[in-house]
Amino acid sequence: MTKKLLFTFFILLNTIAFSQNISLSEKAKVSILTCGLGPESYAMYGHTGIRIQDSIHAIDVVYNYGAFDFSTPNFIGRFIKGDLQYFVTNGSFIDFYYNYQAENREIIEQVLALTPAQI
């Protein structure tokens, strides 16, 4: 399932990048955001997002994979069985940060050692 999510994420990322013709600068960074545990059943194992940051082009976005629809019938049962339909969302880092801080959940950022050509 994780491989499917990563594949979907990279397809979406490439689609967005090509559709908007975004060129990242030499200062761009990519990082993994690991979020702490939450009290709800769906947050018991934490969460992960991918952050793309480029101060030159004022880009600071998080691709949040593993999102799901809370209105799914039998949500908890399907979640426990691993039978939910997951999808990728994106939004500003500041919104992502404030959402997790409001829930008193830590965020650990690991900047990936990528060259500009790899980004």
Give the location of each predicted region.
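Sec-dependent N-terminal signal peptides
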Residues: 4-14
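Short, intrinsically disordered, charge-balanced linker/junction segments flanking boundaries
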Residues: 110, 114-119
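Active-site-adjacent bridging/hinge elements
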Residues: 22-25, 119
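Glycine-rich catalytic cores of cysteine/serine-nucleophile enzymes that process amide/ester linkages
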Residues: 25-111
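Boundary at the C-terminal end of the N-terminal hydrophobic targeting segment
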Residues: 17-21
